[in-house]
């Protein structure tokens, strides 16, 4: 016989929170040397996004790989940013910096696809950007590339944002 709470449980299970997807970028084994030997842990880097202009990344460390991934996903959901888009691309060219890693992101014509490699491609895919060109300059470790890309995406402004800034600057001059 069915329990009265079964239907509620099923609906909660089927409904994902805002349809947020995650993709694993890297897993690193971390070793700490202690008096008794070596302590092994795992670090995971995950990118999360909803393919509708929201994307984030997170890192997690734990004794087991699945737990590290879970922690990284939770951290990524807390760190999501809104990415402005124009159709299927970004509004303008932008440079992202983090440490010695630099990422140049350029808008591309519709239908040209994502010309990017590794972590940048995953970020663009989960952000819902399907036409963009990128170039990685300097450090190319996955975490530096991710942080530089997120820095670049956070610098993007829409045409309306720029017009508001110009109007406010003009009113300050008067």
Swiss-Prot record:
One of its GO terms (molecular function) is rRNA binding. With S4 and S12 plays an important role in translational accuracy. Located at the back of the 30S subunit body where it stabilizes the conformation of the head with respect to the body. This is Small ribosomal subunit protein uS5. SUPFAM superfamilies: dsRNA-binding domain-like (SSF54768), Ribosomal protein S5 domain 2-like (SSF54211). GO terms for cellular component: small ribosomal subunit. The N-terminal domain interacts with the head of the 30S subunit; the C-terminal domain interacts with the body and contacts protein S4. The interaction surface between S4 and S5 is involved in control of translational fidelity. The lineage of its organism: Bacteria, Bacillati, Bacillota, Bacilli, Lactobacillales. It comes from Lactobacillus gasseri (strain ATCC 33323 / DSM 20243 / BCRC 14619 / CIP 102991 / JCM 1131 / KCTC 3163 / NCIMB 11718 / NCTC 13722 / AM63). NCBIfam families: rpsE_bact (TIGR01021). The gene is rpsE. HAMAP family: Ribosomal_uS5_B. The keyword Ribonucleoprotein applies. Pfam families: Ribosomal_S5 (PF00333), Ribosomal_S5_C (PF03719).
